[in-house]
Amino acid sequence: STILNIVKGDTLLLQRTVPYGTNAVVTEVMDEKGVDATTAMTLLQNERLVTVDFDDNAATGAFRYLINNVGRVIDYYVAKNPDKPIDDVFLTGDGALIRGIDGLFKIQLNIQTKIMDSLYNVKFDPKIDLKIYNPVYLISPIGAAFAPMGFRPSEVKSKTGGNTEYAKYCAAAMG
């Protein structure tokens, strides 16, 4: 599934879960190429199998439900908040590493789309292999460590002293 967050500054305006993700396109490539899931994802990341039009090929068409559902969430948000337009879409996670996904989102949703493949002002230890630990996977945990949203049961908060110590712990655990 895919989690959509609409954020302005440091305020979460809307969060929705869409029950579609990269599974459909990975399955399509597996069937078409006769490969396993890992190889299919590698092909999607290294070859331009995804274009900007759903009708170009089956792999691109497999994103139709995901993008249509994202579009519905965006339409809902815009209808409820006409004074707060969405300027950009930022992609993270496995799907963000698929070549051409940003162009597909941009054309189909008519919104500027960017892949969050780097973290500004974050320096990694040179020993960390960024090909394995790609920054697109680290955005959520790093964000949660620096600015937790407070989604923790009260009994856990009382044992740890609140969110501040939790944020320090997460930041320390990430190294």
Predicted regions and their residues:
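Hydrophobic/aromatic-enriched cytosolic interaction surfaces used to assemble or bind macromolecules
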Residues: 1-175
